[in-house]
């Protein structure tokens, strides 16, 4: 797998190389696939969702609108393929 890069909002970029997920924008956060799980909330009344990255008892939340959520689909599928539990 090559490097996957997805814009997750106007000031946020998410990259995944098959082993490490990195979130850029503000502070940089890194997640290893062996320690990561992901939950995705259902859409609220405005179509917004919350993608939550869980690692070692810490949660990092990525609030996204519907177009951004659609862009994240390839990333969520790649995470699932790497063995990351993705719920929602």
Task: Mark where each language-model region is.
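Acidic, Ser/Thr- and proline-rich intrinsically disordered linker/docking segments
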Residues: 1-3, 9, 24, 29-88
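Polybasic phosphoinositide-binding surfaces of eukaryotic membrane-targeting domains
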Residues: 9-21
């Amino acid at each position: 797998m090559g490097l996957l890069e997805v814009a997750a909002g106007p000031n946020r970029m998410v990259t995944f190389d098959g082993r490490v997920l990195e979130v850029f924008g503000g502070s940089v956060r890194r997640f290893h696939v062996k320690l990561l799980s992901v939950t995705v909330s259902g859409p609220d009344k405005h179509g917004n969702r919350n993608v939550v990255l869980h690692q070692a008892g810490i949660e990092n939340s990525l609030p996204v609108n519907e177009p951004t959520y659609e862009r994240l689909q390839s990333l969520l599928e790649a995470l699932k393929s790497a063995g990351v539990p993705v719920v929602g």
